[in-house]
Amino acid sequence: MKKIFRLILMLIILWNIVQINIFSQEKTKKYNKIIPLTLNGDEMLLSLITDKSRLVALSGKIKKGKCPDELYNKTLKFEKVENNVELVIDLEPDLVLIMDWMGKDKISQLEDAGIDTFVYKTSRTYEEQHKLFRELAELVDEQEQGKKILKDMDERLEKLQKQIKEKSKDKASPRILLYSPIEETEGIGTLYDDMIKLIYGQNLAAELGLKGTGKISKEKVIDINPEIILIPVWGMHEKKGTDKLLNILLKDKSFEEVKAVKEKKVYIVAHKYQTITSQYLIDAIEMLGKEVYQLED
């Protein structure tokens, strides 16, 4: 009987030690009052931070109707700072995420207030986004959650690429042009260019030597004769109400000999997917792959 009692007592002591260690680990995280000032900062931290009490506020850039409801609903319980540096300082965070293009003045204000800042650049490739996410996971002590999310991204990319290879076996890479309603496209050094490479396509704007975002004339579109045209639409996360825009291009007489128009391979895509720099980049790549190769879900 005494042996059983001692065993039970030892188990209780061990359980308490484990709980104390877990509690201690949570309390010793370097940053526990975090605020992101960007859309992608909101997106990354909402998925990365397991204990949401460590998020003091969000940037407020995730808007209803411009993203899936599931993502928007995750933001409802948080205060939104909306680029108000004074409000950020009043909330007394110990870490603020801010992008380099937001300006040295804002960064200096935060640092002068004794707040640590994580200043980062816009990712231009899948690998750069991968690296950024790893660094952020390390910074906020969420390495395991970070590994889990990155593993999911890599597995989904591998699966998509396998589907594409199977469907396009023995076929040349599709010649693709992003062509906005204001005659803009994306060339060398853009995230979109890297996404097209990842789905084994040819970005015609890059092949023309265009760097970054730039204009492309209707005459040039006709001249390069793309096999697939992608039309980006602002604020769209679903394909509702886009038929009118599609028909404008399909019924344009000057485009009637363009291969993409003749074969009705003109597709509407959400503009957000050109510039998405969070773990949701994989959603954008999947969307592009499914549109370009007409893959089933």
Go through the PLM ranges and name each one.
Residues 8-19:
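Bacterial N-terminal signal peptides
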Residues 28-33, 106-180, 184, 205-206, ...:
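Extracytoplasmic substrate-binding proteins
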Residues 33-91, 95-101, 201-204:
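A short, structured surface patch at a secondary-structure boundary
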Residues 59-62, 191-213, 268:
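His/Asp/Glu-enriched short active-site or ligand-binding loop at hydrolase and phosphoryl-transfer sites
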Residues 85-92, 113, 215-225:
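Short helices/loops that flank or line small-molecule/ion binding pockets
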